[in-house]
């Protein structure tokens, strides 16, 4: 019997697609949803399943930003083949994304027992939701938001990419919340910070999904729930990306901050009352 049913996979796919790129924590919401459905959140197969369905969300990024990604890959390939083409900003930016992914990969491999064990607790999710909200508020209030995508530098990419470690270690912090907030603190405007967050998500989440695939399949999740959850997350994530880019062009992040705090308080109350298990 599969550790996750097709019906549960649909629900988790919707949650993943809605929350992966919104700064509200997909991992936190997935763990909450799993807890409410009496799915063991620290089960190896379940952890693997949640990582694999992220690939659907990443596929949505690849489709949505296909023109940008094709431009980056083309420039990178030309630069590798021809040293004279290495002055192209797209060639340089592609290397920045690769460099900026290295820290989170190293920490992810080294800290995996902690990530899959004690740090998977829903109490950690509640605390991380609050901590991430504080960072978002600070970044939104005190960042100058004056630098666009053309002003990006290697330090920007490295600092923003390294901030993904916060979400890796503390589910509830939010990968997109951490990266966008760090970008704002670096004085990027909201659209530039959000687009950088999307591009950094591609290698990080794809690698995590492929790495965890063996645990999801070998641990007792059948192919049907994996496929359904991934496909659902793709379509929902695509709509979420389009909405978020329009939203950040005109609004601050106060609505997300309020929502995160409310979810953290509600989750803490449910845990304290024994309605769900940590």
UniProtKB/Swiss-Prot annotation:
InterPro entries, per database record: UppP
EC number(s) stated in the UniProt entry for this protein: 3.6.1.27
GO BP, sorted A to Z: cell wall organization; peptidoglycan biosynthetic process; regulation of cell shape; response to antibiotic
Keyword Oxidoreductase listed: no
Topology in the lipid bilayer: Multi-pass membrane protein
Pfam families according to UniProt: BacA
Keywords of this entry: Antibiotic resistance, Cell membrane, Cell shape, Cell wall biogenesis/degradation, Hydrolase, Membrane, Peptidoglycan synthesis, Transmembrane, Transmembrane helix
Further remark: Bacitracin is thought to be involved in the inhibition of peptidoglycan synthesis by sequestering undecaprenyl diphosphate, thereby reducing the pool of lipid carrier available.
Name of the protein this chain belongs to: Undecaprenyl-diphosphatase 1
Lineage of origin: Bacteria, Bacillati, Actinomycetota, Actinomycetes, Frankiales
């Amino acid at each position: 019997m599969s550790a996750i049913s097709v019906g549960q996979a649909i629900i988790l796919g919707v949650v993943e697609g809605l929350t992966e790129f919104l700064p509200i924590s997909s991992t936190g919401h997935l763990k909450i949803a799993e807890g409410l459905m009496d799915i063991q959140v620290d089960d190896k197969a379940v952890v693997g399943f949640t990582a694999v369905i992220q690939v659907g969300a990443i596929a949505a990024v690849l489709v949505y930003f296909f023109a940008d990604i094709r431009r980056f890959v083309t420039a990178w390939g030309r630069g590798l083949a021809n040293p004279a083409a290495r002055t192209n900003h797209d060639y340089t930016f592609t290397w920045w994304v690769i460099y900026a992914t290295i820290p989170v990969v190293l920490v992810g491999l080294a800290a995996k027992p902690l990530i899959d064990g004690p740090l998977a607790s829903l109490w950690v999710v509640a605390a991380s939701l609050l901590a991430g909200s504080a960072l978002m508020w600070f970044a939104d209030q005190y960042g100058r938001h004056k630098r666009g995508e053309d002003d990006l530098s290697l330090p920007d990419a490295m600092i923003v990419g390294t901030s993904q470690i916060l979400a890796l270690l503390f589910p509830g912090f939010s990968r997109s919340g951490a990266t966008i907030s760090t970008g704002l603190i670096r004085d990027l405007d909201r659209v530039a910070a959000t687009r950088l967050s999307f591009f950094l998500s591609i290698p990080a989440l794809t690698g995590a999904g492929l790495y965890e695939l063996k645990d999801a399949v070998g641990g007792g999740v059948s192919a049907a729930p994996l496929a359904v959850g991934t496909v659902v997350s793709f379509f929902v994530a695509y709509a979420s990306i389009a909405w978020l880019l329009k939203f950040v062009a005109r609004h601050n992040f106060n609505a997300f901050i309020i929502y995160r705090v409310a979810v953290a308080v509600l989750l803490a109350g449910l845990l304290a009352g024994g309605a769900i298990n940590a």
